[in-house]
Regions:
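OB-fold and OB-like single-stranded nucleic-acid-recognition modules
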Residues: 1-113
Length: 113
């Protein structure tokens, strides 16, 4: 291995997400086409701006076993903390495809019911 190959690439780019929000759909376990088991749900994140409150909803997938197990115990209305990355996904719709964004959680925990 050369010295250049051993050094990490440092582009300055980052894909990190930290959200605290309210669960707005019942967490659902499913198996993706590639065989991965995941739990999916949506969260609502409310923030205040100077002019008005803002609500953003995010689709979240959780793949690691520990967080999947925890997410399956959550109820709509629970406040949760999500750490992860943003992923752009595609799926076929008729003759075309549709793009959507999902938060892929690497860590997820309930803060309060």
């Amino acid at each position: 291995m050369t010295a250049a190959a051993a050094e990490p690439v440092t582009s300055g780019h980052r894909n990190e997400v930290y959200l605290v929000g309210e669960v707005i759909t019942v967490p659902d376990e499913r198996t993706f086409a590639d065989g991965r088991d995941v739990v999916t749900f949506r969260i609502d994140v409310r923030t205040e701006s100077e002019s008005r409150p803002i609500r953003d909803s995010f689709d979240v997938t959780v793949a690691n076993a520990r967080s999947r197990k925890a997410a399956l115990t959550w109820d709509v209305g629970d406040t949760v903390e999500i750490e992860g990355v943003v992923r752009r996904r595609f799926h076929r719709v008729g003759a075309g495809s549709r793009a959507f964004v999902v938060i892929e959680a690497t860590r997820a925990k309930r803060l309060r019911r």
